[in-house]
Amino acid sequence: MNKLTEEQIQELYTFTHDHFVYHFDLQTELVDHLANGIEVLLLQHPNLLFNEALQMEFKKFGVFGFQEVVEERRKALNKKYLKIIFNFYKAYFTIPKIMLTVILTILLYTTLSSFTPNYQHSIIMVLYLSFFAIAFIRLIKYNTILKKKKHKWMLEEILLTQMGLFSLFQLPIHILNMPVEIESSYFLGLMSFFNVSIIILFYVMVFQIPSKAEDLLEKTYPEYKMTKTL
């Protein structure tokens, strides 16, 4: 079977980009799929031109072109991201971290118990808003790094922006839905544990996972390491 030339492969990358596929990882998958199909067509029809074979392969994607593939891939990577969060969160809770969680819960409970219900609500608000400010600054920094990169990666975009920002925007909602009066010590204890657990979850999502993003990308895409040297 005649293999496509490097120039033709680059044409396929340009073709996918022109059809609204901007992530290099997805472009590579589509280019590989298109190239295989085109090579088969050219073998079966030697007189067929490259562009004609390309259009024939593209028609197989239907009226919406690559968009359905893009959406399916995004859904799959979102599921992968949720699995990554779970694994990081699970790995985070070693014995020392469990002890730290208990200590932080007791500390928060003791602090809240020293104040009236209205002040308790204010303390929780300050706690969340402080974390929100720090995390938001970090996400802006990561987003700036993404924009400077030559290639966009869908998983990287999800890792560093979409899911992180989604988690942050849940904080104000969580704050607004909190009860103003917390009189039960049992409920106060549960709320202290819940808030500590939520903050640890956000810490893992905003700080731990982004710091390991390159390792995750290299494991997912072997070509990622190669593109860093280009």
Residues covered by each model-derived region:
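Bimodal feature
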Residues: 18, 29, 43, 77, ...
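Alpha-helical protein-protein interaction elements
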Residues: 7, 50-53, 58, 73, ...
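C-terminal alpha-helix/helix-terminus motif
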Residues: 8, 61, 65-68, 217, ...
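Cytosolic juxtamembrane regions of integral membrane proteins
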Residues: 48-107
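N-terminal, intrinsically disordered, low-complexity segments
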Residues: 1-64
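Hydrophobic alpha-helical bundles in membrane proteins
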Residues: 86-230
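Intrinsically disordered, low-complexity regions enriched in small/polar residues
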Residues: 30, 52, 63, 83, ...
